[in-house]
Structure formats: C-alpha cells, structure tokens
Amino acid sequence: MSWCIEDHPDGGLQITHLAAPRFTARWTTGAFPIDQVREGAFFWTDEGHGLDDTIHFYAFEWTDPPDNVDIKRLMDRSAYAIEVYVMG
C-alpha cells in the first residue's frame, strides 16, 4: 500500500504517499480553501469527473522532492486513492 489517508492534526484530512516521491498533503473537496494556502506554495486541484467532487491538495510537505516525476500522473493517482477511500 503506498497511500495513507488520515485525520490531519489541525483538522480536516491528509494524504501521504509512502513511496518515492514521498509527500504528505492536506486535501478537501468542494470550494478551494484559499485561506489555507500560503502565497507561492504548490497546490493542485483535480476537477473530478461526472458526479465526483473537485479535490484540492494543499500544504504539501515533500520528503523526496519530485525530480523528473510526472506530477499530473502522481496527482491523478492521489485523487484516485481519495476516491477509493471515500467510497469505502
């Protein structure tokens, strides 16, 4: 298993990618949490498909900064992991 989804200590939820490039990011659905994003910080929005909600990733903490990694593919996989989590 390369994903861990759990509560964030400050509230809300976080996702952790346990394989390189390793990272932890907070995430939410619905409206973009602009008040939670630092100016100049990396964030990602997955628009969803059909009835799926938009997923926003923010407050990234990189253990292994992504070097030569397809960020879109990594974020698509992150969104899929969250969809699986939500569907239970």
Predicted segment positions?
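A sequence-composition feature that detects small, non-aromatic residues
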Residues: 19-20, 25, 31, 41, ...
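Amphipathic, interaction-prone secondary-structure segments
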Residues: 1-33
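Mixed-charge, Lys/Arg-enriched low-complexity segments
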Residues: 46-88
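Acidic, low-complexity, intrinsically disordered interaction modules
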Residues: 28-56
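DE-rich, low-complexity intrinsically disordered acidic tracts
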Residues: 17, 37-45, 72-76
